[in-house]
Amino acid sequence: MLFRSPELIPNFADEFADGVRPRLTVALLNGDVALVGVSGEFFSNHSIRLKERARVKQLFFFGYCNGYHQYFPTIEAVAEGGYGADNAVSPAAVGAGEQIMNSALIWIYQMLGKIK
């Protein structure tokens, strides 16, 4: 059972009043090493899938960069439920993590010259 603390709600109400606006930072070093930073706690499958799709020698994925926007569960995790996938602790829209990973992938491919 997920523990809920109503007294914590005011702490997040102001922060997320205009919705969740996560930050994404992507850098590519020598065409071999991708650095991806996001402002939140992303479920590990996001980074695993990104690494498989990016096709660079090394990909380093960092959470908690330039802010913190709670949890970004995978769509599958939301469907399964459980800690971190409940909207009480994950105010991001379902699929937001996948959208951010797609943006990161596009940026990596642009830096590699594969997409203009």
Language model features with spans:
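Non-catalytic substrate/cofactor recognition surfaces at enzyme active-site rims
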Residues: M1-K116
